[in-house]
Amino acid sequence: MGGEDMAKKKAPSAKEGEKQQGFKEIIPEVTEKLVEQARKEVARERWVTPHKLAQKMGVKVSIARRVLRILEEEGVLVLFTRNRRSPLYLPKKKVPTAPPRGL
């Protein structure tokens, strides 16, 4: 009766197939290509967080966090501040300097 109809699996529609193609590519590890792409993205920004970089590059936040640490070690970025959630990085050339004392 009705059980036979429920046992049949629904064939995926064209729209569902399109949705599956829209998923982000899963990159399990940090590659040199990914670091180079991030270096170009960071150079254009005034500041960057792991979330902001993840959105721009289409990767997970954990991967973006690792990439930012690598760029900090290379001297491309400077850790400006860290709160309980995410660090804020500045490109090395855009780090604010304090005015001289006594002026």
Swiss-Prot record:
What are the disulphide bonds in this sequence? none
UniProt keyword Ribonucleoprotein, yes or no? yes
Please tell me one Gene Ontology term that the record gives under cellular component.
ribonucleoprotein complex
By its UniProt entry, which InterPro entries does this protein fall under? Answer: Ribosomal_eS25, WH-like_DNA-bd_sf, WH_DNA-bd_sf
Superkingdom is Archaea
Q: Which UniProt keywords apply?
A: Ribonucleoprotein, Ribosomal protein
Annotated region (Disordered) at 1-23
* Family classification: Belongs to the eukaryotic ribosomal protein eS25 family.
* Protein name as it appears in the record: Small ribosomal subunit protein eS25
| Organism encoding this protein | Aeropyrum pernix (strain ATCC 700893 / DSM 11879 / JCM 9820 / NBRC 100138 / K1)
